[in-house]
Amino acid sequence: LIKKAVPFHDAVMAIAAPFTGEPKELFKTVTRFSNISWGDETLALVTEVLRTKQRYKVSVFNAKAGSLNTLYERSLTDAYTNLGNPVTHKNKYGKDVIATVNNGRSVLMNNTTGASDKGDLPYLSIYNLDTKTNEIIWRSKEDCFEYVADVLDATNLKMITRRETEKEVPNY
């Protein structure tokens, strides 16, 4: 619950290894900080949530430039505007990082619910960080429930899906 009007509510700090120096402020958030998903030094997706007003906000953080810019905001209760979660892959250190396409200017988003006026139709989309537009590139058919379980190759869009129908059990 946010009771006072202030310029920011949370500050995200970092300290460099071997963790003996002073912490450095990365950015401040207007509402409550919820999560950060890292890509590289120029891309991290920062999530802010304000539960009392049912608001959800995603921004892109560029650690190299020190900038935080809003990508989109939506209502937490509006499933139709939920873009899903960024697809991740393991980097050379074995850590999950955001999978990018189009020379790092777009992010793959996986919506395993895919609320639509025709029911739940999960989808995979490409979110363009420059134009702030989302393009659905794969969607479950209406006669089944199928979602992307894993993206094996983001560049060539090789993926594994889990599929089931009223008469067929899930394929794995």
Predicted regions and their residues:
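Peripheral, non-catalytic segments that deliver or gate enzyme domains
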Residues: 1-172
